[in-house]
Regions:
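Alpha-helix capping/helix-boundary segments
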Residues: 12, 39, 100, 118-119, ...
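Short, well-structured N-terminal submotif of metal-dependent ribonuclease cores
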Residues: 1-36
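Acidic active-site catalytic centers that drive phospho-/nucleotidyl reactions
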Residues: 8, 97, 116
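Active-site neighborhoods of divalent-metal-dependent phosphate/nucleic-acid chemistry enzymes
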Residues: 72-111
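Acidic, PIN/NYN-like endoribonuclease modules and their adjacent C-terminal/linker elements
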Residues: 105-113, 117-141
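Short, glycine/charged-enriched secondary-structure capping and boundary segments
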Residues: 19-22, 27, 48-49, 126-129
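Short, solvent-exposed loop/turn segments at secondary-structure junctions
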Residues: 15, 83-86, 121-122
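PIN-domain endoribonuclease scaffold, especially VapC-family toxins
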Residues: 28-29, 34-86
Length: 141
């Protein structure tokens, strides 16, 4: 079975730049990987922030690597899920990630992969299958 899997920013960042469960997930061909415009914007900001002390060329290479990794992932435009912002706001108080949850509500993935614990509430877990990378890998093997 091919699962539709929404990837949060922290999963993308770890999967692109580090070896581990997240990078293994990005390499699984049998998954329909999806993320949101907001997650991608956050990813690009995080890459620039984490590498700000390195040379401009190193940052360019890291951003190019990011774009290459994103080429295999469906990126849902913000305009598609803005109507879900109010619903997301009722489920979560962590304002920064309300757009991410709105995208998840719109996309309705089989799994929502994240390392952010504020998504692992009973209220959110009733609506979407929230899971971390470590627990997700055994399910698809």
């Amino acid at each position: 079975m091919i699962y539709k899997v929404f990837l949060d920013t922290n999963i993308l960042l770890s999967g692109i730049f580090f070896d581990g469960n997240e990078s293994k997930i990005l390499d699984v061909v049998e998954l329909n990987l999806v993320t949101s415009e907001d997650a991608v914007d956050e990813l690009r900001r995080a890459v620039k922030k984490k590498l700000k002390y390195l040379t401009e060329r190193t940052i360019e290479i890291a951003l190019a690597e990011t774009e290459k990794a994103l080429s295999d992932i469906v990126i849902v435009p913000r305009a598609k899920y803005t109507h879900k912002l109010k619903e997301a706001e009722t489920l979560m108080k962590y304002k920064k990630d309300i757009p991410i949850l709105a995208a998840v509500l719109y996309i309705e993935p089989d799994y929502f992969l994240t390392g952010d614990m504020h998504f692992f509430t009973d209220q959110i877990k009733k609506i979407v299958n929230v899971i971390n990378a470590r627990d997700f890998l055994p399910r698809i093997k």
